[in-house]
């Protein structure tokens, strides 16, 4: 199922992949079930959200930092993305000559989704 960003979920989930950071942290903590896991792989909106430590330890939530994996991990991830028919949200696309405009949009926080640069 797909839910609107920030929408209340019908039930708590086993795991959350948190790649946004401060602006979505609270929603991620409230969305995961007791004993669930939050996997953090990015913090584009800031890396110092309110920690919500009380909720995390009372709910026995596991917080796991994640970076890059092996080539084999990446190959498995690509197969999963293809099989699950996942597509990123594209905010906008720019020619490489307009890269300054694209980065300006990111710096100003005027982005919902990915910014593409055509090379």
Feature map (PLM): residue ranges:
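Short conserved AdoMet
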Residues: 33-34, 111
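Short, well-ordered alpha-helical microsegments
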Residues: 25-26, 49, 74, 100
């Amino acid at each position: 199922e797909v839910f609107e960003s920030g929408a209340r979920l019908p039930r708590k989930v086993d795991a959350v992949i948190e790649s946004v950071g401060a602006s979505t942290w609270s929603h991620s903590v409230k969305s995961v079930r007791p004993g669930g896991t939050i996997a953090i792989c990015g913090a584009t909106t800031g890396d110092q959200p309110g920690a919500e430590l009380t909720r995390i330890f009372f709910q026995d939530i596991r917080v796991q930092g994640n970076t890059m994996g092996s080539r084999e991990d990446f190959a498995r991830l690509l197969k999963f993305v293809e099989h699950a028919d996942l597509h990123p949200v594209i905010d906008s696309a720019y020619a490489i000559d307009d890269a300054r405009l694209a980065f300006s949009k990111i710096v100003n926080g005027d982005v919902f989704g990915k910014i593409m640069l055509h090379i």
